[in-house]
A protein has these predicted regions:
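Outer membrane beta-barrel strand-and-loop segments of large Gram-negative receptors
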Residues: 327-329, 333-340, 381-389, 474-475, ...
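Surface-exposed extracellular loop regions of Gram-negative outer-membrane beta-barrel proteins
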Residues: 243-245, 251-256, 367, 411-413, ...
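Flexible loop and strand-edge segments within Gram-negative outer membrane beta-barrel domains
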Residues: 212, 232-288, 296-331, 373, ...
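Gram-negative outer-membrane beta-barrel transporters
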Residues: 395-401, 500-504, 523-622, 663, ...
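Periplasmic-side early beta-strands and strand-to-turn transitions of outer-membrane beta-barrels
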Residues: 152-154, 161, 176, 180-268, ...
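Extracytoplasmic beta-strand/coil segments of soluble accessory domains associated
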Residues: 64-103
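A beta-strand signature from Gram-negative outer-membrane beta-barrel systems
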Residues: 117-165
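N-terminal periplasmic "start-of-domain" segments of outer-membrane beta-barrel proteins
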Residues: 33-66, 84, 92
């Protein structure tokens, strides 16, 4: 068996990495370490990743639950798009969600997430933390959640040409789920059709309070058709749909409280179409990965000014808008990627390619509002961006050096009919030094830029869009991350860690226009410009020990973000350097993870315990009716127990059980809005819940 530390194995990992990162096979059993498919490629020493095998052994139904024992990424909030994502505290405006090479950067509304992802359809999730290297793709300033969906070959068992998968789950906190898939692969043809259905009613938090507005009906579909011409060439056509429907207000992140209540029928639907080609060993090219895609997002919600109970009785919302009249906003992203790799000499490789994306938004119709404000001359928002890159991996045993250069360019056409364009070069460099078979060091310095996003689709026809002027000298945001890390492995003991510093300059500010509601006039136009800097620094440490069937783990992460410059939240300037929001960052502070599990061989049963802890941290925010709040997020400690039983002693049948939040703790995640406002109350996390799930492939 080839040693995992031999030069050829180390290079095979780097062929996959192709970036200024750290590559290793983490926490796999000794007999599996030589399998290339087990290798995890990550941009930092402490990995954040999840595989299909892990998901099948859990009761998780959303990405928040999937990521709760991962270091460096947080998800907080209610259900569905009420959840906010962050990577090392950096918010969604600076991070990417890439699914099978498809992505978009436009958001509907700052009171909801722009990400939708059902883990039931996923093969693997790898989180690239912080500023990416040259090959990381468009806009990789804060990190990328890189997702691969399942293929037929991932699910087939015992050499069969076709198969089925069935699954179901129940939660004591008013939730149920069911899923089914049929798939096959024969004579080069493969097909997969999968669906997942989730029904969550309003859940209770740790104090027994019902968090109204957390109710969610969700379905997701995945369809794939493909053909492998031979072992080196294949094409795939994929359709993916994510659909969420609930009883929400116009601001999904808040509960339905007092007179601020939701409306049935609000929904978000995302549909993506993706055509992929995979080629290997084509002349001087070792690898060709290419795709073209389109993503369409529809969002309906109540008009601004949520209906009150009295308005429900009369059939109209505040402002005289009928209850049944929901506003529809649309986003479309179309793009293509071409990624190539060539090897030469004594274990050297160059990766190079092109990324392209075009985005448009169609705001909800606010004709009456626009007429009042005199905003007649307006356009749809649109943006085009492309990037070209080259990246080299140089085998200088015992050092592997990576160097990269990327050029990105954008052109942005705003609703105000004004435009801006800008191009920028971004270098990256990194090194891995294998001091010996057990100890490695890494260092990297990455730079990346991110084009401005389109205005929020819901607001592009008013104060945040048509009434805002675009700075003709607008530039892309530029991020630079420096990181030092290590990994040490000795028999069954593993320790990895890193320290990092990241700076994002020329932050793009979307300052809204000021409107006098009494006179229905614009008193000051808004502006889109470069206005600030976001600095984050911190560290991560992860340690694990395995002895027979026993595995113990402990980890810690710490991030301190600071915001400076002429920054605005809406029409108001920020009040402090720790003023958080979904636009920039969440103060996640210092967080700890602990775990202990034991794997029995007969019966094939794993039982475990997980502890999650967050220390209190200061923050600044604005709450409705409360003004500026300089507060402290309460710390918390939450414990879960879980079990996975495989009755057939194989991974095709899993029976899963969990008790989450055993102590019934009432708490809020640090990766979401924290303070209560008048009628604007953010969601708490779920209280104690018992969860049971089963999945079977045959």
């Amino acid at each position: 068996m080839k040693s995992p530390h031999s030069p050829s194995f180390r290079f095979s990992i780097m062929v996959l990495a192709l970036s200024s990162g750290f590559a290793h096979a983490d926490n796999v059993r000794p007999e599996a370490t030589a399998e290339l498919k087990e290798v995890v490629v990550t941009g930092t020493a402490v990995p954040t990743r999840v595989t299909r095998n892990q998901l099948d052994r859990e009761t998780s139904t959303d990405l928040k639950q999937v990521m709760k024992d991962q270091i460096g990424m947080d998800v907080g909030g209610g259900n569905g798009v009420a959840q906010f994502y962050s990577i090392r505290s950096v918010g969604e405006d600076k991070i990417n969600l890439e699914v099978d090479g498809t992505s978009q950067s436009t958001k509907i509304f700052h009171h909801q997430s722009r990400f939708q992802l059902d883990p039931a359809l996923v093969k693997s999730i790898n989180v690239e933390k912080g500023t990416g290297a040259a090959s990381a793709g468009l806009g990789a300033v804060g990190g990328t959640i890189r997702v691969t969906t399942v293929d037929a070959k991932d699910l087939l068992t015992d050499g069969k040409p076709f198969g089925f998968k069935l699954g179901a789950g129940l939660s004591s906190n008013k939730g149920s789920t069911g899923n089914a898939a049929v798939y096959g692969y024969q004579n080069g043809f493969d097909a997969l059709f999968a669906g997942n259905f989730l029904n969550n009613r309003d859940y209770k938090d740790g104090n027994g309070n019902v968090n109204r507005g957390s109710r969610l009906k969700q379905h997701s579909y995945l369809a794939k058709l493909g053909y492998d011409f031979n072992d080196d060439h294949g094409i795939r056509l994929t359709y993916r749909q994510e659909y969420q429907k609930g009883n929400r207000t116009d601001k999904a992140e808040f509960q339905n409280v007092d007179s601020y209540v939701g409306v049935d029928g609000t929904y978000q639907k995302e549909q993506s179409y993706n055509l992929e080609y995979r080629g290997r060993n084509v002349g001087f090219l070792d690898k060709i990965d290419a795709n073209v895609f389109q993503i369409n997002t529809d969002d309906t919600k109540p008009p601004k000014g949520a209906p009150s109970p009295k308005a429900h009785a009369s059939g109209t919302a505040q402002g005289g808008v009928p209850i049944g009249q929901l506003e529809l906003s649309k986003i479309k992203a179309t793009g293509a990627n071409l990624n190539l790799a060539s090897s030469f000499g004594d274990g050297h490789m160059v990766k190079y390619g092109v990324n392209y994306r075009h985005e448009t938004s169609e705001p909800s119709d606010k004709g009456a509002w626009l007429k009042i404000l005199g905003l007649y001359d307006r356009d749809k928002e649109k943006k085009a961006e492309y990037g070209v890159y080259a990246e080299g991996i140089w085998n200088l045993h015992p050092v592997t050096l990576t160097t990269g250069l990327r050029y990105d360019h954008f052109k942005y056409n705003a609703a105000s009919k004004q435009s801006a364009s800008h191009g920028q070069l971004n270098p990256s460099i990194g090194a891995i030094w294998d001091i010996n078979d057990n100890f490695s060091l890494l260092a990297n310095l990455n730079q990346a830029s991110r084009a401005p996003r389109l205005n929020e689709a819901l607001l592009a026809n008013e104060r945040a869009g048509a009434a805002a002027d675009l700075d003709g000298n607008l530039k892309a945001e530029t991020a630079r991350r420096a990181e030092l890390g290590f990994k040490w492995r000795n028999d069954n003991f593993n320790v990895s860690g890193s320290v990092f510093h990241q700076r994002i300059k020329d932050l793009i500010v979307y300052r809204w226009a000021k409107i006098n509601n009494n006179t229905a006039s614009i008193t000051e136009r808004g502006k889109i410009y470069n206005g600030g800097t976001l600095k984050t620094y911190g560290y991560e440490l992860d340690a694990s020990y395995r002895w027979g069937g026993l595995t113990a783990r402990a980890g810690v992460s710490y991030v301190k973000p600071r915001l400076n410059g002429e920054m605005y939240y809406g029409e108001s300037p920020i009040q402090a350097e720790d003023h958080e929001s979904s636009f920039t960052f969440w103060n996640t502070g210092r967080q700890w993870l602990t775990g202990l599990s034991y794997q029995f061989e007969n019966p094939k049963l794993e039982i475990g315990w997980r502890g999650r802890y967050a220390q209190s941290v200061k923050y600044t925010d604005v709450a409705r009716g409360q003004g500026t709040i300089h507060g402290k997020k309460a710390g918390y400690g939450v414990h879960d127990i879980y079990a996975n039983w495989q009755p057939l002693k194989k991974d095709n049948l899993n029976v899963n059980f969990a008790v989450n939040n055993i102590g019934n703790k009432q708490y809020r995640s640090h990766s979401q809005r924290f303070p209560d406002g008048n009628g604007r109350v953010p969601f708490y996390e779920r209280g104690r819940e018992f969860a049971l799930g089963v999945n079977y492939r045959f």
